[in-house]
Amino acid sequence: MSSHTPAPALYGGSANRRVTVQDLAAAKERGERWPMLTAYDALTARIFDEAGIPVLLVGDSAAMVVFGYDSTIPVTLDDMIPLTAAVSRATKRALVVADLPFGSYQAGPEQALESAARLMKEGGAQAVKLEGGHRVIAQVEALVSAGIPVMGHIGLTPQSVNVLGGYRVQGRSEEAAEALLSDAKELERAGVFSVVLECVPARVGAEITRQLTVPTIGIGAGPDTDAQVLVWQDMAGLSPRVAKFVKSYANLAEQLRDAATSFAEEVVAGTFPDEQHSYA
């Protein structure tokens, strides 16, 4: 690309190739913000891909929104692989990032490598995400050395909810904010291509974003991060309860209830199927 040719926009850009981690880095240099959504199945992944969402996260939040658990802890690597494969098969442009679930990397670098390799070989992921700062640096370095792109995740780390004492905002005190910044810088030095900041004060999200050269992705981290992510069911108004940081852009729960009710009423009344929906 010549110096006179503008870089393609990250959101809604060309569908001729996959978004890469280099594209995300270039977007930060340009000051271009971008969206990320979760996806767990082929149909929604295809819709989001067609909508121009540049990064899709196959999140361990599947534990709650797909499998019905009350935390992310129970979901397994064997659960995550087919979900990742479905999203990868259904998309042409979005960078597909898969969460390393609880228990799949904490034992050390070797376990992390084995788990990430499965998500990439069997699931088709182009990158993986893991939670934690200083305590997972060895895992991050091993993954990056093996050629596996890694997205970091600090702040509220749901896999550690039992240690954190619940789903609470992190980094409110000066000491806690400094610890988060230290973790973020360590992750950057270890080679992550981006860092998720979850449930931290807006000022902390802004400062970490300012000090890192890699993109930050906010979820409840204020307006100044380089990107924003939401669980798609929260974004679309399907979840029954959402956090303060969630904005719902549709009321999918009500639409689905209305559709199911209309279908049921027509079946009971004998008006579906009608001639239009029957074979001659």
Curated annotation (Swiss-Prot):
It is an enzyme of class 2 (transferase). It comes from the Bacteria. Binds 1 Mg(2+) ion per subunit. Mg(2+) binds at D60, D99, E131. Its EC number is 2.1.2.11. The active site is at E198. Keywords: Cytoplasm, Magnesium, Metal-binding, Pantothenate biosynthesis, Transferase. Pathway: Cofactor biosynthesis; (R)-pantothenate biosynthesis; (R)-pantoate from 3-methyl-2-oxobutanoate: step 1/2. Its cofactor is Mg(2+). GO terms for molecular function: 3-methyl-2-oxobutanoate hydroxymethyltransferase activity; magnesium ion binding. GO terms for cellular component: cytoplasm. Catalyzes the reversible reaction in which hydroxymethyl group from 5,10-methylenetetrahydrofolate is transferred onto alpha-ketoisovalerate to form ketopantoate. This is 3-methyl-2-oxobutanoate hydroxymethyltransferase. It comes from Thermobifida fusca (strain YX). The lineage of its organism: Bacteria, Bacillati, Actinomycetota, Actinomycetes, Streptosporangiales.
